UniProtKB/Swiss-Prot annotation:
The active site is at E313. Its EC number is 2.4.2.21. This is Nicotinate-nucleotide--dimethylbenzimidazole phosphoribosyltransferase. Belongs to the CobT family. NCBIfam families: cobT_DBIPRT, PRK00105.1. It catalyses: 5,6-dimethylbenzimidazole + nicotinate beta-D-ribonucleotide = alpha-ribazole 5'-phosphate + nicotinate + H(+). GO terms for biological process: cobalamin biosynthetic process. HAMAP family: CobT. The keyword Metal-binding does not apply. InterPro entries: Nict_dMeBzImd_PRibTrfase, Nict_dMeBzImd_PRibTrfase_bact, Nict_dMeBzImd_PRibTrfase_N, Nict_dMeBzImd_PRibTrfase_sf. Keywords: Cobalamin biosynthesis, Glycosyltransferase, Transferase. Catalyzes the synthesis of alpha-ribazole-5'-phosphate from nicotinate mononucleotide (NAMN) and 5,6-dimethylbenzimidazole (DMB).
Amino acid sequence: MVPAELFARVEFPDHKILAQTKDFHDSLTKPPGSLGKLEQIGCFISACQGQIPPRPLNNSKIVVFAGDHGVATKGVSAYPSSVSLQMAENITNGGAAINVIARTTGTSVRLIDTSLDHEAWGDERVSRSCGSIDVEDAMTQEQVERALKIGKRIADQEVDAGADILIPGDLGIGNTTTAAALVGTFTLAEPVVVVGRGTGIDDEAWKLKVSAIRDAMFRARDLRQDPIAIARKISSPDLAAMAAFIAQAAVRRTPVLLDGVVVTAAALLANKLAPGARRWFIAGHRSTEPAHSVALNALALDPILELGMSLGEGSGAATALPLVKIAVDLMNDMSTFSSAGVDGPLNASSEAPEQNTE
């Protein structure tokens, strides 16, 4: 399988609409540019939807991809792998941080168990955990193809159900090790540059993590132009499915609000699977994991928030979601200088450009 067999060509957000949105924003009752990044976000959503002003974002969806990682047995995490399944149950029961944030923002949460370490099976399952990427492939060819198809199918389900913005989340002990290996491989960053503390590891565990990532990157050193091979060798079923989910969202012209290092590593892979997918990304926040900044720079993304978060689950992106909604609502609900009878700036038109709702 090659990516072109799975993903259609990605069309970019409407650049003509994007150019017109600045004039639209300048017609609103405020000094030009005074809403800062909120203006940029609103303009981006307009371009994604192909209309000015953009439709309000009333159907956001958080999809958390869960899986265990064989590399977790190498001492790279402060927690045992059993926590992954326990936290998945916590999310299902509504007791995790992402559930609280989602309820506050009026967003639903869906958990996808691709590869947690238990016997259950279903349409969204790929395997029970995965290979330890420092010494063996994460998946077989059959498994990676299944993971990619699952992620693509879930994106189609959510878009077909009316989702207007998607937030992928992650869950799984050891997944920051896998994410750092992917980021290092795609960006050619050294292992020590991309390795963070994950769940709060000590110095000895950090050294083990550096070693595991170094070995994984070495195993993938000749595969940078083959994203499916990289996914098979050094990712995991949950990250591969997440990458396909992100890639297909872009194919379906649906913006993706990115979370932390694991999600952004999957976004790097998604942009390789479906070139141009990054044009549909917004970075919700910058996490404390070093690899996250490396990945954001590679995708040319400037995050909305920087709150020192590193939880995962989609929590940072979900926290940023209200600001994205505000950016859209400002374009819909603010008065223009003309409609409000307010004098605009000197030597400038106060009329908004013609709205395009096609």
